[in-house]
Amino acid sequence: MSDSGNNFFILRRLFGFTKPYRSILWTSTFLAILLAPLNALTPYLTHLMVDNHIMKADLPGLQKMALLFVLVLITTTGLRYLFTILTNTLGQNVIKDIRNKVFAHLLGMKLAYFDKTPVGTNTTRTVNDLESVNVVFAEGLITIMADVLGLLTILGMMFYTSVKLTFISLVSFPLLLIASYIFKEKVKVSYQRVRTEVARMNSFLQEHISGMRIVQIFTAEKKIAAKFKSINKTYTRANLDGIFYYAVFFPVVEIISAASLGFMVWWGAKGVLGGAVTVGQLVAFPMFIARLFQPVRMLADKFNSLQMGLIAGGRIFHTLDNQEKDYDSGNIHLDKLKGEVVFDRVSFSYDGITPVLNDISFTLEAGKSLAIVGSTGSGKSTMISILNRLYEVENGVISIDGINIKEYDLETLRGNIGLVLQDVFLFYGSVYDNISLNNPNISHQQIEEASKTIGADIFFKVLPGGYEYQVTERGSNLSMGQRQLISFVRALVYQPNILILDEATSSIDNQTEAIIQNAIDKLTKGRTSIIIAHRLSTIKNVDKILVLEKGKIVESGSQQELLAHPNGLFSRLYLTHFDPIQA
């Protein structure tokens, strides 16, 4: 069993994040210790007021005691307010730090992790689970410690006031402890189910809202709605189970408390009549019982809150402990690479079983262009991914400028490779932000000059607000051509020496097509270029073409050389698959 599943270990790790806020932690702890006797003091003061002053008609003494009583109440209220503020401040600051750490950790994970982990699960870890962890500080350990100290202080004060009345009051106490234990165990199981269903629901919503276009195109709304209703029903049932346990537990506690109080009053009244119990003791003990049963009732709830926070903490640490980090950087750091790319007997599979690339070898000289063609699933996009070290090759070597890409640090490698994908991912923000990716070293002037260079400036300036136009999530308020142009400008401003272009297969208007072709010509000029080609206008100008089939290179050469073999795969693809648009 991993340490991340051990409650004590989770608690220790969570409190490790309190180091920058130790002053708040220790002040909260001190207040918890201070509040314990103050909470038990008011019933005892009531006992003294009745027996020593009211029963003896000592008005001056009663006034002094009443003033002390009010002072204790005001002090207790003020300290409890400060305690609540401090514990919640501690919790929010710790959650802020953990959330930053979780997100930074996710940014450094391999793509393989995201391939198998639903987006909703990571969202739940970063948002929902961390809100539950906040309970560990706001309502958890420190508050539980305060309640336990208060409980012990009240018991001590009760015994000091009257041993007999204390034992009478505690007759039903074992029943309360048993009820609290059963409640704690039942709610713990219920909460685990709720958290599991929340993650499942988040994943489902994230996936289907992102894919709403497909859902609507294939008129799958009713089926998706039915599936969501099923997930939602399971989630609701898990919540109702927890509500049921709460609905049963608190009335049971009230019944036990009322029975204890009634029995104590009956026995105490007999004691008053017989002279064994004073009136002040009888008046004070209902207050003692209320203060005794309240923390016990709340402790069961708070233990569950703590348990919920620890379960959520365990899930968070499971993510943080996941070692599927991005591949280690090498030690070679260079500002610019020349751009010679060599694949030497490279093989790769995503699952370690089914080969996607098999014994791929080719050399692309610096400044030359290469087109990769092949049917869907032949391995074209995979070659791009392993060149960027988004995945690691299993066999063979990929080198740039004669050096294994594993020896370059990732900043050098990826910083020298410009990537233009056919599925352009845009973030919510301005056109400027989507081009610069919030890089402060890229100025507005550079972006505008790059846009003019490839002819995209006219498209951006007609947008409301121009370059400040707010792009919605995934660029849904832009056309396919506009999204493509943003990716071209993005590649140009970063000035890579190696360009990888995955041409879009979607049809666009002739004007945009001409600008995109011009952009391709400008981007590839003088750069090592690898193009996954879908248009004749692109492949006719490249220096070399690779033809892939089932992860293997089956043909290579120039367009003229490959077309010289009419029965070859390239000739067949040329006639049946390529978009005949000419630049």
What are these regions (language model features)?
Residues 106, 228, 316, 343-345:
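Conserved catalytic Walker-motif region of ABC-type ATPase nucleotide-binding domains
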